[in-house]
UniProtKB/Swiss-Prot annotation:
Homodimer. Represses a number of genes involved in the response to DNA damage (SOS response), including recA and lexA. In the presence of single-stranded DNA, RecA interacts with LexA causing an autocatalytic cleavage which disrupts the DNA-binding part of LexA, leading to derepression of the SOS regulon and eventually DNA repair. This is LexA repressor. The gene is lexA. InterPro entries: LexA, LexA-like, LexA/Signal_pep-like_sf, LexA_DNA-bd_dom, LexA_repressor, Peptidase_S24_LexA, Peptidase_S24_S26A/B/C, WH-like_DNA-bd_sf. Transmembrane segments: none annotated. HAMAP family: LexA (MF_00015). It comes from Rhodospirillum rubrum (strain ATCC 11170 / ATH 1.1.1 / DSM 467 / LMG 4362 / NCIMB 8255 / S1). The record marks A137, G138 as: Cleavage.
Amino acid sequence: MLTRKQYLLLSFIDQRLKLSGVSPSFDEMKDALGLKSKSGIHRLIKGLEERGFLKRLPHRARALEVLRLPCNLTFDGDGEALDDGQPAPLFGGPLPETGFSPQVIRGNFTPTLPSTQVPQVLFTESISLPLLGKIAAGTPIAALIDPTSSIDVPASMVRGGEHFALRIEGDSMIEAGILSGDLAVVRRCDEAENGTVIVALVDNEEATLKRLRRKGASIALEPANRAFKTQIYGPDRVRIQGRLVGLIRSY
């Protein structure tokens, strides 16, 4: 049985590990949950360890391993989570052993998710982001345009920095859990580490969503679909516009 804060912390740690391969710092965890001190994070991690959801790796700084994620999760009136104890994934799909797995919010987002949706967590805050149009997860399409509308997303997705949203079009990233029609939440940046899923602007004309790989002086934009080929460009042909931090999926 998990408390709401334990569940949210476990979700945050799992998301960060899948995005970057590195556990968040205690300060980052404290800020993400809105706590005033790191002692509260220590207590939450201890509780997750005792319940078999989390493991601290010895002799390594900031080393946490998510052992399992709860399924069929609901909260009772006291904020306790009722879990059937099975090692199932948090967001309803298979838990990958490696590779990128973005945070996915299912359903059309509103500040409070209906109880019939998964995960059944109440998001009390939202933030409005500019929706810049469509981006290809396939063959690059037209470059990013000025915002024509906006969309509300959970505030926990956009901690720090400038963010925007794009509608995914194409299926070249499906093996990373990124589907055509998903709404991508992107943090604006012009640098990214190898393996990061980025928004890339090619030849100042076409935008695409791919995994970044640096190969010597060249830049490779790598799909997550065996039917597509990796595209390699000179460093002066590709500009990083941002990195993917989350997805919103409608059904």
